[in-house]
Amino acid sequence: MRLARSENRAYQLRLLEAYPLCQICERQQSIECHHVRYGRFGADKDDSKQIVVCRECHQWCHAHKKGSIEKYEEVADENWQRFGDC
């Protein structure tokens, strides 16, 4: 599901407010949102599939894309159920 840019940003801000720690390692430094499902250059990006991660875990997710999708999609789905009503 693609959201309008403003809706996606509102959703990301809700996630970052709700989760001040990385949802993978629970560190607090440099947290940001990561799209669990995304395609090359944004093709097939699913804005409803996002988790909050620190910079290190974000890099790990991109380096291990296949494993991270399966591992964190359930967390992303729970996030959307809780905060997806932008």
Regions found by a protein language model. Give the residues of each.
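Short recognition patches in nucleic-acid-associated and regulatory proteins
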Residues: 30-41
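Polybasic, low-complexity binding patches
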Residues: 2-3, 40-52, 59-86
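Broad hydrophobic/π-residue packing in well-ordered secondary structure
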Residues: 12, 35, 66-69
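Short cysteine-rich loop/turn motifs with clustered Cys
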Residues: 5-32, 56
